[in-house]
Amino acid sequence: TYAGTVFRRQDDEESRPNEYTQVGYEMFDRAEPISADAEVFALITQALGAAPVKAATGDIGILVAAVSALETSEARKGALLRHIWRPQKFRALLEQFSTPSVARDVLGLDNPFENAGPEIGLRRTSDVKDRLDELRADAQITPISKTVVDLLDALLNIRAMLPLAVAQLWDLAVEMPAIGPAVERLGARMIALKTRGVDIEKIEFATSYGRSLMEYYDGFVFGFYAETRTDLPPIATGGRYDALTKQLGQGAEIPAVGGVIRPDLLLDLEGAA
């Protein structure tokens, strides 16, 4: 556990403070990550007490599993995976990769550098040649089928209370078997939450939830929002960030999950109640 001052740049909403107090709880557990997810969520729920908030959850791992199993090039899958946390860019790439490529004139030239001027900037002729080779290879790739795009859309559009969402995901897993293990983990997490006294019927789940939050969340993700103050940012947030520990540890990783509460926002809610 920890408590301290957080400094955060606000690019889009200048009215939000750049500095505020945050209280957090983190767990590092190799043995039972699902249990750790449930424990962190349950403790945050308990700490919020009777505050008028509603819970929203997601699981980035489900979409990661779906994208990783696409029958397309590794380069295209890599691009989609990098932009999971940028929904608009992800959508643009998905549309691009599901449309037959239009060969650019320059790709068909025997010598695209004929009559070229002097090299300017950091990119050398060899870099441009490599990029042209990549574009030629990409132009030969079979587009992602409309059926697969429709399945991804159906996956991203799932939004319901947790038990119903799990059922809907299992139905979709019939056509998308690659998401099965991730959905199984979600179901196990739901049971673990219920075991800890959390009312799972009041937890909303959306496959897309968390894609515009912190990019380092790569699995379970959650947030608590004021029911009557839609102008406020999340009162509490959290999630799993296994990949971040691997990045920071330079290959030495440990499964990690945590959550934070904004005491100032919680006091605002209690004062308004």
Q: What does each model-found stretch correspond to?
A:
Residues 1-2, 78, 96, 205:
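Short coil/turn segments at secondary-structure boundaries
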Residues 2-53, 105-273:
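Positively charged, Gly/Ser-enriched RNA/tRNA-binding surfaces
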Residues 19-24, 57-66:
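Short, conserved phosphate-binding/catalytic loop or strand-edge motifs used
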Residues 48, 70-71, 88, 193:
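Short, well-ordered alpha-helical segments in soluble proteins
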Residues 55-59, 83, 207:
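A generic structural motif
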Residues 64-69, 217:
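A short acidic (Asp/Glu
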Residues 72-102, 226-227:
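Acidic, His- and aromatic-enriched active-site or binding-groove loops in soluble protein domains
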